[in-house]
């Protein structure tokens, strides 16, 4: 499966993942809204929104 692999303001790239899921995490701090994308569907801390999917990108 192909997932986006991205940290906040960096341009999105793609990565082939064996986990079978992709995630997108968003949260806010003193820098503003932070977005992180990657493979799998990790557990997150309270206050962090996460969306997981099982289709490419």
UniProtKB/Swiss-Prot annotation:
Keywords: Acetylcholine receptor inhibiting toxin, Disulfide bond, Ion channel impairing toxin, Neurotoxin, Postsynaptic neurotoxin, Secreted, Toxin. Disulfide bonds join 3-22, 17-39, 41-52. It is found in: Secreted. GO terms for cellular component: extracellular region. It holds the Pfam family Toxin_cobra-type. Expressed by the venom gland. It comes from the Eukaryota. Its main location: secreted. Produces peripheral paralysis by blocking neuromuscular transmission at the postsynaptic site. Binds to and inhibits the endogenous nicotinic acetylcholine receptors (nAChR). This neurotoxin is lethal to mice by intraperitoneal or intravenous injection. Belongs to the three-finger toxin family. Short-chain subfamily. Type I alpha-neurotoxin sub-subfamily. This is Three-finger toxin Tschuditoxin-I. It comes from Micrurus tschudii.
